[in-house]
C-alpha cells in the first residue's frame, strides 16, 4: 500500500486497538489504506463569518469519501474581532491565532492525518490555519466561508451600501439621532459571512488565492451565493487527488512549502499592496513565512511597497465598494491578471488547482479568458435578503465590471495611485519599522507634522477622543499595546472610528505599537517596533513632542535631539518598561504565557521558544 502517514495508526498487528477505535468512528475494512483527510472546520455561533459553517464540513467530507478518501472533521476556536473589540476581549484575538495553529497541529499529528481541508473565514482563523499548514507541510486546500453581503440603508433620502464600520462611526457622532443609529446597526451586517469590506478576514482569504492554496473566487464570492458551494465540493475532490499524488506518486510539488515559496509570498504581498489590504496581513504573512522557513521579511515588504501601485480601493478606503463589487470585476484573479500584465508577479509558481499561476490566470482572469462559465461565476451577486444560511440564493449581475480605467479594479496605467496601498516607515521612533495602510490615507496628510498626545492604553485614548480633548494637529500616541505590552496587541478600530466621528479623520494621526482593524483608515500607523514594553522609543515620547510623518519618503521621526532621547532612555530603564499609569486590566495566566514568548510585530509576533 502507499506509505500514508496514517499507516502508523491503521496497519500492523500492534495497531489492533487503534483500528478498533477507528472502526468505532465508522471506518470499515475497505477504508484502511485510504488517505485520511482532516476536515479542519471552525464553526461557531459566536461569529457571523462562521455561523454558517456547521454543515459545510460534512459537505466537504462527503466529497472526500466519494473521491476515495476517509474524512474526519474537527473544529477550532474562532474569535470575532468585532465583538471582542473595545474591551479586554481584544487581548485574546492575536494570541488565538497561535492557539489555532497549535490545535490543528495537535489534532493532525496525534491522529496521523494524511492531508487536510481548512475551512476558515475570519481574522485570526485563516492565519492560524495557514501557519499550521506551513508547519505540518502535508497536502492542504483552503476554502473560506466567504464575505457577507454589504448592508444597505436608506438614509436621508439616499440608499447607500454600508458595513460594520459605518455603524461604529455614526454611533459616536452626535449629529445622528438614536433612530438613525439603530437603522445603521440593523442594516450593517445583513447576512452570514466575513465583514463585507477589504478588512483582515477578506484580505487573508484573498491572499490564499495568491499563495496558490485556495481555489479562484475564494476571497470574493459572497457566502450566500449557490456558486460558493462549488468551491467546497471541489476542495473535497481536490484534496484526495493531491494526497494520492504525494503519497502514491511521490509528487512533493503539491506540498504547502513547495507552493508557498518566497516567490509566492512576494506575490501575495504584491496583491495585498495592490488591493489595499489590511495591515494585519503583514503580521500574518510574516508568521506564515516563519513557519514555512521562508526568508520573507519587512525589508521585502518595504521593497514591494515602493513599486506596486494601488489597483483597487475597497471599504474602508472607498466606502461604497465592497467584496461583492470586487467579485463582479473578476475577483482576485483579475487583480493578479493586471499585476501580471504590469510584470509585477512571478507567475511560474504552482497552485493547488493549476500547474502554474500563469495557467490559472489564463483560465480565470476575465480579461484574457473566453470561458462563459468563468464569466457567469464572476457575475454571482448578492441576494439582498438577510440570512444566516450559506448558498441560499442564486442571483446574478447582468454584466461584469471589466472597466480597467474607471472600474473597481484598474490596470496599472490607470491605477488609483502609483504608490502602494501599504507602506513601511522607519525612523528613531520605529527602528525596526511600522506599518501604515496608505490606501486609506487622504493625499492631503501623506506628510504630517503634529504634537504628541501620549496615552498608556487604548482605553485612555478613547476617553480623551470622546471627551473632545483631541484637537486638529495632534498625533495620538497609544503605547504598551504591543504583542508583549498589551499583551496581545489590541486593534485600534474604536479610536480611529471615533476620530472620524469627531471630524478629525483628516486632521490627526494615530501612532501605536498596537495594531489596527482592517476596518481602520486615516493616518493610522501601527506595529511600531520595537514596542514600548521591549524598550522601544515609542515608550520615550512625551506630551508636546513633535512627530514628523513622511509617507512618500517612508519616514517617521520624533523631533528631539539624540542626547535628550538618550537621557530619557536612561531614566526609563531605571524605572522599568511599563505604563506610567496603572491600568485596570486583568491579565490572565494564558495571556502572561503568550507575553513571555511572543516577539515583535516586525517579526510577525511569532513565538520564540
UniProtKB/Swiss-Prot annotation:
InterPro entries documented for this protein: Dihydro-acid_dehy_C (IPR042096), DihydroxyA_deHydtase (IPR004404), DiOHA_6PGluconate_deHydtase_CS (IPR020558), ILV_EDD_C (IPR056740), ILV_EDD_N (IPR000581), IlvD/EDD_N (IPR037237)
GO molecular function, one term: 2 iron, 2 sulfur cluster binding
Keyword Lipoprotein belongs to the record: no
Keywords carried by this UniProt record: 2Fe-2S, Amino-acid biosynthesis, Branched-chain amino acid biosynthesis, Iron, Iron-sulfur, Lyase, Magnesium, Metal-binding
Active-site residues per Swiss-Prot or TrEMBL entry: 517 (proton acceptor)
Family: Belongs to the IlvD/Edd family.
E.C. number(s) listed in UniProt: 4.2.1.9
GO biological processes: isoleucine biosynthetic process; L-valine biosynthetic process
Cofactor: [2Fe-2S] cluster; Mg(2+)
Modification type N6-carboxylysine: residues: 124
Residues the entry annotates as binding [2Fe-2S] cluster: 122, 195
Name the UniProt record assigns to this protein: Dihydroxy-acid dehydratase
One Gene Ontology cellular component: cytosol
Gene3D superfamilies linked to this entry: IlvD/EDD C-terminal domain-like
Function: Functions in the biosynthesis of branched-chain amino acids. Catalyzes the dehydration of (2R,3R)-2,3-dihydroxy-3-methylpentanoate (2,3-dihydroxy-3-methylvalerate) into 2-oxo-3-methylpentanoate (2-oxo-3-methylvalerate) and of (2R)-2,3-dihydroxy-3-methylbutanoate (2,3-dihydroxyisovalerate) into 2-oxo-3-methylbutanoate (2-oxoisovalerate), the penultimate precursor to L-isoleucine and L-valine, respectively.
Residues annotated to bind Mg(2+): 81, 123-124, 491
Pfam families, per database record: ILV_EDD_C, ILVD_EDD_N
Gene (name only): ilvD
Cofactor binding summary note: Binds 1 [2Fe-2S] cluster per subunit. This cluster acts as a Lewis acid cofactor.
Organism encoding this protein: Acinetobacter baumannii (strain SDF)
Catalytic activity: (2R)-2,3-dihydroxy-3-methylbutanoate = 3-methyl-2-oxobutanoate + H2O; (2R,3R)-2,3-dihydroxy-3-methylpentanoate = (S)-3-methyl-2-oxopentanoate + H2O
Subunit details: Homodimer.
Pathway given in the UniProt record: Amino-acid biosynthesis; L-isoleucine biosynthesis; L-isoleucine from 2-oxobutanoate: step 3/4; Amino-acid biosynthesis; L-valine biosynthesis; L-valine from pyruvate: step 3/4
